[in-house]
Amino acid sequence: MSRRGTAEKRTAKSDPIFRNRLVNMVVNRIMKDGKKSLAYQILYRAVKKIQQKTETNPLLVLRQAIRRVTPNIGVKTRRNKKGSTRKVPIEIGSKQGRALAIRWLLEASQKRPGRNMAFKLSSELVDAAKGSGGAIRKKEATHRMAEANRALAHFR
């Protein structure tokens, strides 16, 4: 733990084409081994496919998908005095929820069958915006787990 004080939170930069911070957050999560230009290519191709599929603004589809997948409540594993572990429901803030939503969308799109990542990502984003898809199932499973363990909420 640092003794110098708390580091100030850095804000995400906006991407060069859409001038949007959310797009840059998604690109940073797509990126592997520092290959940011490849991550931009994947996202921009996915955005083009969304434009072709829905004929609406693809940024609105992206925002809608992330908003639908963002969880309000989650579970955190806690160990009690006897050594058994319990999943305690906790509230999730907006920033952490957005980060989880982006992560879940990318994981669900990677698991999809398909040709390339851009195609899979575009399909997952369109499905999530409509209220279906793997990321939505993940959110619902998390909410179900938190609801089932609601009696343990006082263990925080």
Swiss-Prot record:
Q: What is the lineage of its organism?
A: Eukaryota, Viridiplantae, Streptophyta, Embryophyta, Tracheophyta
Q: What is the scientific name of the source organism?
A: Sorghum bicolor
**Gene3D superfamilies given in the database record:** Ribosomal protein S7 domain
Note the SUPFAM superfamilies from the entry. Ribosomal protein S7
What does this chain do? One of the primary rRNA binding proteins, it binds directly to 16S rRNA where it nucleates assembly of the head domain of the 30S subunit.
Which protein is depicted?
Small ribosomal subunit protein uS7cz/uS7cy
Which Gene Ontology MF annotations are present? Answer: mRNA binding; rRNA binding; structural constituent of ribosome
Q: In the UniProt record, does the keyword Ribonucleoprotein occur?
A: yes
User: Keyword annotations for this protein?
Assistant: Chloroplast, Plastid, Ribonucleoprotein, Ribosomal protein, RNA-binding, rRNA-binding
The record's subunit annotation is:
Part of the 30S ribosomal subunit.
Q: Which gene encodes it?
A: rps7-A
Q: Which CDD domains match?
A: uS7_Chloroplast
